[in-house]
Amino acid sequence: MRLNALQHSRASDKLIYTLHYLALSHGRSVGPQRIEITLDLTHQDFANLTGLTRETAATELNKLKHQDVITYSKHTLYQLDLAKLTAMLNDQYISDIQIKL
């Protein structure tokens, strides 16, 4: 599988797509439209996954936190509002994602 979104998108697009993927593949439901990622991930881990710097990954995660899309603590427990995250995926924020199998 090739993810063109991670090659050409903005930093926010890369992070949103990665969070959505992690929520679906490694998440567990903790409430209505709330998913907890069951991996122990740091800002550096997100940077490595997306090809961003640690600082950029942290900045983008904080933006999503202020938009109430994601909550997390310094103990790296990530909970996502799946409805908001999916809306961002379907919105104009991520217009150039292509997945080729």
Positions of predicted regions on the chain:
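A small-molecule sensor/coupling module
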Residues: 1-16, 97-101
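Amphipathic, well-packed alpha-helical segments that form the structural scaffold of globular domains
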Residues: 16-24
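Phosphate-/nucleic-acid-contacting segments
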Residues: 25-101
